[in-house]
Amino acid sequence: RRLSEAGLATRIVFLIYVDLLWPPLEQTIVNKDRFVLMFAPIVRTYSETFEAGDTLPELPPFERNKLAFPKSVDANVAFLKAWQAIFDGDSFDFDYHLMWDHSNDPGHMQIARTIAADMQGLGKIGLNGYVSCQIQRIFLPTGLAMTVMGRTLWNAATDFDAVADDYFRSAFGADGPACRDYLERVSGLFDPVYIRGEKEWVDAEQAQRFAR
């Protein structure tokens, strides 16, 4: 109110993050045009992608200093939807695909696919944009993940395989298809889902993949 009285058009970003995942029970935002919601699902899994599921889990109760934060995408989106029920202003995703999870995928092919699907899914879950919290030196083995991110944010109808084929041809010339096949194999053999700890540690099939 004081900003409005002073004639200031300053906008304020507020976070849905850690303890603030839980929406308020009593307070409300009066001037939605003043505020922008930032969804920051820092403990989410990258084995799943953003979708607007028909059935979402109920929110667990808020218990100060005893909180368990959601890992599944559905559980994180459930918190987002609870906030959207009381705030329908502008919003964006602040996410961490290339902050650390790329380390679980040495080939970067599976995380690149997740990024593409998440960029396409932003509108489906009611978000208007994306800010990437990431390291800057993210181009080993390739810059595909960044390329996919940029192109799919620009056009949500972008086809992942078309971008990947174009990228590898542009970067490696006639060897592009072979380079892509190699990195697809690296991603598959390491199995990011396993490295994230989302499968049993003792896994004979995974041991065989590592042996290759």
Where are these regions (language model features)?
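Charged, amphipathic alpha-helical linkers/stalks
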Residues: L153-R196
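Histidine-centered catalytic/metal-binding microenvironments
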Residues: I195-R212
